[in-house]
């Protein structure tokens, strides 16, 4: 059953716009504030309501939805100023844009069966500390009540309870508002992963079901991209990189760095990590390393040392490692850049806070310096790394560093014999 067929079963014939909105309401799927603005009833707004239900922005906004249009354009002050009516829908929409104004008690009463949405909005924007409880709310309204309660449960550490609430929310609205149900499935996947402390098959199933529900929601590209990224990360952590990679690519096709910079950067960084860890079975697979290098460079246009230190350091380190092994006609230049990248990472990898992480960077940097023939500097880095590995009992790492040091000794002996 589609959103359109459900909507058409309830004719929208309140032309003056003073009555309550026609259900199902297109709420909850788009992000705040647009996602909670009610659509005034009337023949002039019906096409827009159906578009929003399907996850699409209207190509033409009716005059009575000027506030919605202005919100989409990013002018919330103008949107608030456009809501001059005293009918319940206009007052509710003003409350969404300015929760500090108005009288919630009167508004709640005037909205009738939709009154609980006042409490949903108040909780969602942080005005109310507790979520509403309304067992009589149905459909998409009841789903949003349960979603608010799930958010509260997660904040209290009750991930299992949140999963149950979100599953119940999906059941309430999947027949009438499938796009909202898809968004809630994605939220349930996140709660399930938090409950299990790992991405289970159930997490992946929920995310892929959410993506199917969002497939035609053309103007919810950020939500679709976020869901693809979440699915990719879950599959990647399960070791199924072959299935994770298409999700990362899909996430990148949907958004730009300007629209969703952190989603875009994360998709690039994790796509690179997937390519770098995937087994290489044929010569053409080496091209993946070059793609990984480009993706990491892209991620680092968003991740900065000041604003995203953890992600920045990870991308820097992976880029350095990629440059070492990437096939190139400028291999020496790549190695020099890798040494510099390692040095920048070492500046934020404290010996006290992350001794083993720092030691691994030192070992990698020492190895590259050795390949560049800078043996004395390389040995200093490698000795430092070996000391930490020995202290923490990492026998394999100690053996690897000793192997590099032995090779340096052989190369230095060879140089002396040639002199």
Features from the language model and the residues they span:
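TPR-repeat structural position
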Residues: 76-77, 104, 159, 197-200, ...
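Structural motif corresponding to the intra-repeat A-B loop/turn of tetratricopeptide repeats
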Residues: 73-74, 101, 156, 195-197, ...
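TPR/TPR-like (Sel1-like) alpha-helical repeat modules
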Residues: 85-89, 109-117, 288-297, 336-343, ...
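Conserved alpha-helical positions within TPR/SEL1-like repeat arrays
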Residues: 144-155, 180-196, 222-237, 262-277, ...
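Flexible inter-repeat linkers and adjacent short helices
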Residues: 1-230, 407, 411-419
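Structural signature of alpha-solenoid helical repeat scaffolds
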Residues: 137, 175-176, 219, 259, ...
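Amphipathic alpha-helical segments of tetratricopeptide repeats
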Residues: 167-172, 208-216, 249-257, 293-305, ...
